[in-house]
Curated annotation (Swiss-Prot):
The keyword Protein transport does not apply. It catalyses: L-glutamate 5-semialdehyde + phosphate + NADP(+) = L-glutamyl 5-phosphate + NADPH + H(+). Pathway: Amino-acid biosynthesis; L-proline biosynthesis; L-glutamate 5-semialdehyde from L-glutamate: step 2/2. The gene is proA. The lineage of its organism: Bacteria, Pseudomonadati, Rhodothermota, Rhodothermia, Rhodothermales. Its main location: cytoplasm. It is found in: Cytoplasm. This is Gamma-glutamyl phosphate reductase. Catalyzes the NADPH-dependent reduction of L-glutamate 5-phosphate into L-glutamate 5-semialdehyde and phosphate. The product spontaneously undergoes cyclization to form 1-pyrroline-5-carboxylate. It comes from Salinibacter ruber (strain DSM 13855 / M31).
């Protein structure tokens, strides 16, 4: 039986030197003070140098990744999870290009907006500023090391990274390349700090450091997210599982529905914006479900359905409550026939994870109602769930897809990694003048 990655499980592969997460976080905070005042030009130049460093260190990064992938296969990890772990030249190029994209985006730090003059004479505005130090806890996706570093850096934040045990060597190699670029530009390397251990105690200590860290962002499986949410003494933005639905309405173009089904389920099933459940209106189920089954069978997808689905598709396995709540991350799909739009919306309300939802319909009022009613950070009409991605939505590299409504919801780009402070200009105005 395949094992699941446990990012917070203790392992023996740690650095030989004594480790103080508190000291690393303190250094990270000191670096954040410098980052907050860096010019946009310096940040962009450093990001481009980071991208170049990743490509220059490709051989070392791939060698380190090979160690992690070999160990993961020996441990019997799921193919879907190994897919997230694997790096290759193309993926390294994409990591580098994502950093260059971030460099090309407008710098939100220092932006002033909404300035108004008050009756007292003062001028009140808001300035966008960095959050400070962001703690990232994530599983076997070494690309997150570069993506998180780049986005946090451009937004003026330092980042303390604790990657998954299974990506230990890969993350170290990626971070080493980034440090080369930081040092070359005279930026404190502590701005991007990777905790060099796989010991669970490091995560537990990290979650208590509210004197140094301003925000925790966990990315990974349900167990990791729950552990962080229940343990952290620092505010958490959860990047929860993606139980994404495709609803084929009675007025749907069924050829479009076929395309979105295949792209959403088959193109890369191991990612959080892949489809996990198919909902089909009863009025088109007799026509669409046999067509969908043929396509899914050809793609090697296992279909599990409710009673109506199984009546239409003999041989399909029964879907359970657990199936409808599952983030499979593999070639398995749950299906259900619904009698109305309300039934589809109710199903999503019960089993969805506030991530990504898709409707296929040619009827505009139905589309508008679905968009307004469904509780998800990204809602798509006649477009693939795979577009629920920071790059595709115009954010550049994303730090993740938040399913927490405060302080960000959906794919998190640069602006989501900043906040605002009030800035007031006056000419000596006082609220309660006192006679001298």
């Amino acid at each position: 039986m395949n094992k699941q990655i446990n990012s917070v499980a203790p392992m023996s592969d740690t650095t030989s030197e004594a480790l103080s997460v508190d000291a690393l976080a303190a250094d990270c905070k000191a670096a954040a003070r410098e980052l907050s005042t860096l010019s946009t030009e310096t940040k962009n130049r450093t990001l481009r140098r980071m991208a170049d460093a990743l490509e220059a260190d490709e051989e070392a990064i791939l060698a380190a990744n090979g160690k992690d992938v070999s160990a993961a296969r020996e441990e019997g990890l799921d193919d879907a999870l190994i897919d997230r772990l694997v790096l290759n030249p193309d993926r390294i190029t994409k990591m580098a290009d994502a950093l260059r994209d971030v460099a090309s985006f407008a710098d939100p730090v220092g932006e002033m907006g909404g300035t108004t003059k008050r009756p007292s004479g003062i001028e009140v505005g808001k300035m966008r500023i960095p959050l400070g130090v962001i703690g990232m806890i994530y599983e076997a996706r070494p690309n997150v090391t570069a993506d998180a570093a780049g986005l946090c850096f451009k937004a003026g934040n330092a980042v303390l990274l604790r990657g998954g045990s299974n990506a230990f060597h890969s993350n170290q190699a990626v971070a080493a390349a980034l440090h080369t670029a930081l040092e070359a530009e005279g930026v404190p390397p502590a701005a991007v700090t990777l905790i060099p251990t796989t010991d669970r105690a490091a995560v537990q200590e990290m979650l208590t450091l509210n004197q140094h860290l301003d925000l925790i962002i966990p990315r990974g499986g349900e167990g990791l997210i729950r552990f962080v949410d229940e343990t952290s003494q620092i505010p958490v933005i959860k990047h929860y599982k993606g139980v994404c639905h495709l609803y084929v309405d009675e007025d749907a173009d069924l050829e479009v529905a076929e395309d979105l089904l295949l792209d959403g389920k088959v193109s890369r099933p191991s990612v959080c914006n892949a489809l996990e459940t198919l909902l089909v209106h009863a009025d088109v189920a007799d026509d669409f479900l046999p067509r969908a089954r043929a396509l899914l069978d050809d793609a090697g997808v296992e279909l599990r359905g409710d009673d109506r689905t199984r009546q239409l598709l003999p041989g399909v396995g029964a879907a359970t409550e657990d199936d409808y709540a599952a983030e499979y991350l593999d070639l398995t799909l749950a299906a259900r026939v619904v009698e109305s739009d309300d039934e589809a919306l109710n199903h999503i309300a019960e089993y969805g994870s506030n991530h990504t939802e898709v409707i296929v319909t040619d009827r505009l009022p139905t589309a508008r109602r679905f968009v307004r009613s469904v509780d998800a950070s990204v809602v798509l009409v006649n477009a693939s769930s795979r577009f629920s991605d920071g790059g595709e939505l115009g954010l550049g590299a994303e730090i993740g897809i938040s399913t927490t409504k405060l302080h960000a919801y959906g794919p998190m780009g640069l602006e989501a990694l900043t906040t605002e402070k009030f800035v007031v200009y006056g000419e000596g105005e006082t609220r309660h003048p006192v006679e001298k």
